[in-house]
Swiss-Prot record:
Coiled coil: none annotated. InterPro entries: GOLGA_cons_dom. This is Putative golgin subfamily A member 2B. Residues 1-20, 95-132 are annotated as: Disordered. It comes from the Eukaryota. It comes from Homo sapiens. Belongs to the GOLGA2 family. The gene is GOLGA2P5. Residues 110-131 have a biased composition (Gly residues). Pfam families: GOLGA2L5.
């Protein structure tokens, strides 16, 4: 037992100035961490507000002379989007925000007979560009 007591050497107590310096360093670190977390939270809240605002946007086709001819909401084909398109869809469609509302252009104004054209992921330009376009885009679909 005496040999065990001899092996245990008490650790020296840190001096008070060292404790104060480490405490000040920790306080400064945590204050910095809190400030950066608050900035990140404010940035994310701004993105959320932007997303929410864009979800309520309504896109209308070119103005019509008679307001009674404005399309009904079911004609707009509201389709929630899971992400931002990597490039704009081409064809007779317009979209806005992260929630896309498909709006066909007036007949005769669209090239290609009013077919939605978008290359799918992993497809090159050319023959695969229009193939399965409504499915490949995944964000906009033609409203029948």
């Amino acid at each position: 037992m005496d040999s065990e007591e001899e092996e245990e050497v008490p650790q020296p107590m840190p001096s008070i100035p060292e404790d104060l310096e480490s405490q000040k360093a920790m306080v400064a670190f945590f204050n910095s961490a809190v400030a950066s977390a608050e900035e990140e939270q404010a940035r994310l809240c701004g993105q959320l507000k932007e997303c929410t605002a864009s979800a309520w946007l309504i896109c209308w086709p070119r103005p019509r002379r008679n307001l009674r001819q404005q399309p009904q909401p079911q004609e707009l084909g509201v389709i929630p989007c899971v992400g931002r398109p990597t490039r704009p869809c081409r064809g007779p469609w317009r979209s806005c925000g992260r929630v896309h509302r498909t709006v066909p252009e007036p007949e005769g104004s669209a090239e290609g007979g009013g077919v939605h054209q978008q290359a799918g992921p992993g497809q090159g330009r050319g023959e695969g560009e229009a193939a399965g376009a409504g499915v490949a885009c995944g964000r906009l679909q033609q409203v029948a």
